[in-house]
Amino acid sequence: MGMNNIRSIIRMIILESVGVQGFKMIFLAGLPGGGKSTLLKQLGIQNQFTTCNIDNFFEPKLMDELGTKNLHDFSERFFDLRAIRDGRSLTPEELEEYEGVKALRGKERTLFRAAINDFKAQVNEICAIGSNFIVDGTAANYDQITSDAERFRTAGYDCAMIFVDIDVETSKERNLQRGREGGRAIYTGIIDDQATRLPGHLEPYREFFGDDRFFLVPNKGTFDEYKENIEQIRPGINAFMGA
């Protein structure tokens, strides 16, 4: 029996176990440090989904190859030195440092491409077998997200998006703090770029997913206010899960 046939049988068994509701997938979107794990925990749905996040594959590769998950520091130094180079010749010491951080950025890109391939393989495997899943990311690339959503819909998934709206400066500070504590920190310039693109995507996302499948959760105040905002989407999430 081929692997595709085995997957089809498993899929039918799971479909029978969940009844006519079928499978759900959620794009969990927003800038880094938005409190997305808090949202899932408060809603109590995290155990009903497999969470797919490139970081799950990227971070181990970073530690194995670079010995750090803090990508901000050497990236910032790279751009600082490049700016100096554009104005004058680098000293021998600066040139050596520049080549070093440039090499680190090259390794980072190679590792990220490998992590993307692993991430895509995980998503494809879940779709082939059939299971609820969450794609955790920023959703800054509108065309990619909507293309993926169409593919998941074709595979029989009911798709939604939860977008956590956080202030860009708060996102950058939490990103840097995570790096200081040994976690992964991306170059803050990436967050600035994402923050300029995301606001223009919100209404298109709402139109694409529909009012009953797009949930915007502001997180620009106190933690208690954020928890209250999460509660505001609970009825809609419950309706989505039960549809």
Place the predicted regions along the sequence by residue:
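Conserved substrate/cofactor phosphate-moiety recognition/catalytic segment
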Residues: L40-S131, D143
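Short hydrophobic/aromatic beta-strand immediately N-terminal to the Walker A/P-loop
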Residues: I26-F27
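Conserved glycine(s) of the Walker
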Residues: G35
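The conserved Walker
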Residues: L31-P32
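Phosphate-binding P-loop
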Residues: S17-F23, E125-C127
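Conserved GTP-binding G-domain of TRAFAC-class P-loop NTPases and closely related GTPase folds
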Residues: E169-A243
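Protein-protein interaction and targeting regions used for scaffolding, dimerization, and localization
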Residues: M1-V18
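Conserved phosphate-donor/acceptor-positioning beta-strand/loop module used by diverse small-molecule
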Residues: A140, R153-N175
